[in-house]
Amino acid sequence: MLRQLRLTMDISGWIFLPWRRSMSNMKDSPPPPPPLASTFNDVIVDYEDPDYLPLPEYPVRPNEPLETRKQRLLYQSRKRGMLENDLLLSTFAAKHLQNFSAEQTAQYDQLINGVSNDWDIYYWATEVKPTPKEYDTEIMGLLKEHVKNAERVTRLRQPDLNI
C-alpha cells in the first residue's frame, strides 16, 4: 500500500509540475514539497554496454533420467508463454516425444530451451527465417514437417494430457 501511495505521489508530481512552476513565480507561495524517492529507480539496471543484456544460461541436467526429462519437456512444450508455440510444440510433443531416443530428447531440449527467443523457434519451424546450423537437427526437420500439417489436423487447442 505504501509503495502504491509513493508511486501515486510521484506520478501526481509529474502531472502537476507545470502548475507548480507557474505558482513558483508568485512571491507569497510556499516552496514546493521535496520530491519523494522514485520507485522506478529501484528496478533500473544499468550496464556499461546498453546493447548487451546478459541472458542466463539454461542449466544442463546431465544426470536427469530420460523419463523425467521427457515429462519436463512435455510441460515446457505446453507452457511457452506464446499461443503459437504452445499449440505447435504441445501437439508436436504429444505426437513424437514418447518415441524419442535419449539423443533426440537432448536435441529437443536444446531446441526449446537453448533459444532465448520463442519467436525464433516459430520462424524457423514455419521456415520464415533460415534455421542456424546448431539448431538444424533431425528434430527441427520433424518439427518443420509437423508445422506443414500434411494430415490437415485441426489444432485449435493443446492435446489432452495422458495421465
Swiss-Prot record:
HAMAP family tied to this protein: SDHAF2 (MF_03057)
Species per Swiss-Prot/TrEMBL record: Drosophila melanogaster (Fruit fly)
Subunit details: Interacts with the flavoprotein subunit within the SDH catalytic dimer.
GO MF annotation list: copper ion binding
Protein name, as recorded: Succinate dehydrogenase assembly factor 2-A, mitochondrial
Entry annotated with the keyword Mitochondrion: yes
Keyword terms, alphabetized: Chaperone, Mitochondrion, Transit peptide
Function: Plays an essential role in the assembly of succinate dehydrogenase (SDH), an enzyme complex (also referred to as respiratory complex II) that is a component of both the tricarboxylic acid (TCA) cycle and the mitochondrial electron transport chain, and which couples the oxidation of succinate to fumarate with the reduction of ubiquinone (coenzyme Q) to ubiquinol. Required for flavinylation (covalent attachment of FAD) of the flavoprotein subunit of the SDH catalytic dimer.
Alphabetized InterPro entries for the sequence: SDH, SDH_sf, SDHAF2
Family in the record: Belongs to the SDHAF2 family.
Cleavable signal peptide: none
Gene3D superfamilies named in the record: Flavinator of succinate dehydrogenase
PANTHER family xrefs: PROTEIN EMI5 HOMOLOG, MITOCHONDRIAL, SUCCINATE DEHYDROGENASE ASSEMBLY FACTOR 2, MITOCHONDRIAL
Primary subcellular site in the record, as a coarse category: mitochondrion
One GO BP annotation of this record: mitochondrial electron transport, succinate to ubiquinone
Localization: Mitochondrion matrix
Transit pept. (range): 1-23
Pfam family, any one: Sdh5
Any GO CC annotation of this UniProt entry: mitochondrial matrix
